[in-house]
Amino acid sequence: MTSWTHLTREQQIAQLEKDWAENPRWKGIKRGYSAADVVKLRGSLQVEHTLAKRGAEKLWNLINTEPFVATLGALTGNQAMQQVKAGLKAIYLSGWQVAGDANSNGEMYPDQSLYSVDSVPKVVKKINATFTRADQIQWSEGKGPGDEGYLDYFAPIVADAEAGFGGVLNAFELMKSMIEAGAAGVHFEDQLAAAKKCGHMGGKVLVPTREAVSKLVAARLAADVMGTPTILLARTDAEAADLVTSEIGRAHV
């Protein structure tokens, strides 16, 4: 594989356009921006995000080869490691778990996005650090891929980005932080971030569909800039929510 650092700007753009056009991974994906836009935002040095990239590839393969992918929520690296040892193929990191007992604020919050925006990425990083340590231990014992008793600890992590903690720029930056931490998949919901409520609570407020889609586009742009095929999941509370900031956007969908 050719390193991005050895390609000119024009070659990087051409290679990215070719990947989008020919790679089955991107079939049906509409971005709303160009390869030139992505390359312009990358800078001259492209940093590799191996855990996020390989995790996304694993998760995509699971989604397309398994009837369903069973996961459990993990608050700590040890919990995630035990889940992998028990046979789970992916890890889920929920925002309500982080709100309740694993946020950067050291508080116990309700599921209303009250915790600091860096909280979920930090837990993702801790889980991947545990996976890395477990892998180092078995490697030091002479166990590698294909050997008896070898366990692939690097299960892909799907992380909760809530409603993006703000607007499109906030979603862009949060997605970057998730990828830097090694998340394989990230989901965003269409609630108003400033009034976010847990799924079973009343008073949920939706944003216009156009705004929700714009956040997803911003998140995909962030992944493209970071050079990872991160799985992007869209969640909606439309079935249960009774309020919306504007009816115009959803009336024209």
Regions found by a protein language model. Give the residues of each.
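Short intrinsically disordered, low-complexity coil segments enriched in acidic
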Residues: 1-3, 251-253
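Intrinsically disordered, low-complexity regulatory segments in eukaryotic proteins
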Residues: 3-12
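A broadly tuned, weak detector of single residues within folded domains
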Residues: 12-13, 76
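Active-site "substrate specificity/gating" loop of NAD(P)-dependent dehydrogenases
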Residues: 66-67
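Alpha/beta enzyme core
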Residues: 19-62, 71-251
